Amino acid sequence: NGELIRAASGERVNYIMSKVAPSGITGNTSFGRLLNEPDLVKLATKAMDLLFKATNTKKHGFFTADFKEDSNGIPYITEINIRMVAFNYSFALGGANFSEDILALMSNDPTFDRTFKMYDFEPGTIFLRDVDVEPILMKESDLTKL
């Protein structure tokens, strides 16, 4: 119905096969963080509102916004996609199950709470991913213990 229902934030730190891309960015995150960044959600929402207003269309579906910070820490949107990020399962492991949310919405599940919810993650939560294996969710402080 054109309303934001769910949101979450994550950070890509390192990338799978980063040496094959001139920029070092492949889009497939090998090491990332689950974040609590309501300001980024507000910026993404503002950008989406502007885009939909400019195209005279109604918001519908799943969207992701990618940001990159400048040297002063100011975030800028680099792209907006109409799909989930590759590390969506890492979000689910952290409690933000967007796939389940979408199924509930599409099936008009009467028990689904359509009130806006920004998923909140335990601070310091990271994920590790590689090709053909399930991601690992852990505390960043535990990474040095391995």
Placement of each model-derived feature along the sequence:
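ATP-dependent carboxylate/phosphate-activation module, predominantly the ATP-grasp catalytic core
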Residues: N1-F52, N81-M106
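Phosphate-binding glycine-rich loops and adjacent basic patches that engage nucleotide phosphates
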Residues: N1-R12, H60-K68, S141-L146
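Intrinsically disordered, low-complexity coil segments
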Residues: K19-I25, F52-K58, N108-D120
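Short beta-strand element of the conserved SAM-dependent methyltransferase core
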Residues: G24, S30, F67, L137-K139
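A sequence-level detector of short, solvent-exposed, charge-rich linear segments
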Residues: N28, K59, F63, F67, ...
